[in-house]
Amino acid sequence: FHPNYSENGYFYVNYTEHNPRRNVIARYSVDPDNPNEADYFSSEIILEVNQPYTNHNGGQMGFGSDGYLYISFGDGGSAGDPQNNGQNLSTLLGSIIRIDIDNPSGNLNYSIPLDNPFIDTQNAREEIYAYGLRNVWRFSWDIETGFLWAADVGQNAWEEIDIIYPGLNYGWNEMEASYCYPPGSNCNPDDFELPVWEYELYVDDVCSVTGGYVYRGNDIWSLKGKYIYGDWCTGDIWAFTLSEDGNHINEDIIRSNINITSFGIDENDELFFCGNGRVFKLQSNEGDLNGDNLLNVLDVILLVNLILAQGYNDIGDLNNDNILNVLDIILLVNMILGD
């Protein structure tokens, strides 16, 4: 949806066409007579990108806080990137692009932001924001730090999580995650921006990463500030903590057994995910100390009794400081009040 959707009614879609096979980025308008329907005849093509193969045609679109539209494109498909699109700045394949759709320029239905990293770079598409990506399956911004997080689906060995910076090369198809590709080949990792996290394919049946969000909601205190993402095959959902010293932490949250296709957030920054034709919300059982599926004064009474018993019980240690005290009571009351 356009940042000013409430005023202009614009929304954008990314779909595939054939003859020739291509990705189409198009703008539609809401039906002026029905706010729950699109005006089918309002379609305006913004951008088309030819696709040489039948896979890696999806991705992500989203508006940044700068008002520009970011779009990810896969490497064109097949296996191993046979056209070397990931390392080719003259194609939009294998990249995340950044365009201004509010100020069309020349014969384009968009313009190039003047601070895009490859402005005036010879033989480079100036739309490109970052490249060397295989098949980004969902990206999102952390609303507090502004970091752009992306999940890039691997080839045969590794799935990766990246933080995207303008102008950087993320390695594909010379690297798969932090490893030279194909295995046994020579590469220089110093030439590329490496993932902040990676996990191995087919271990415990995982196979394809689905990117999520850094959680900034209030319902699940233990997930605050952590990047929540999943795997399509197993439905595993993890919480990743980025550490300045490099000692990152990846925690298992749940194996949902859902083929997770996407994550989303609502107006309160609470987290949802979808798959198997359904939408699910991540909800907390933190604070439900008595296990009755309710957060209420009975949980406070139980916590007070645990504290008065002068022992330690990790059930009541809501702030994880290895002490049961009034700070846990304050946190529990805030959970109940929704603060």
Regions picked out by a protein language model, each given a short descriptive name:
Residues 1-80, 138-154, 205-244, 269-272, ...:
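Acidic, Gly/Ser/Thr-rich repeat motifs that build Ca2+-stabilized beta-propeller blades
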Residues 289-312, 321-339:
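Alpha-helical segments with a strong preference for the paired helices of cellulosomal dockerin domains
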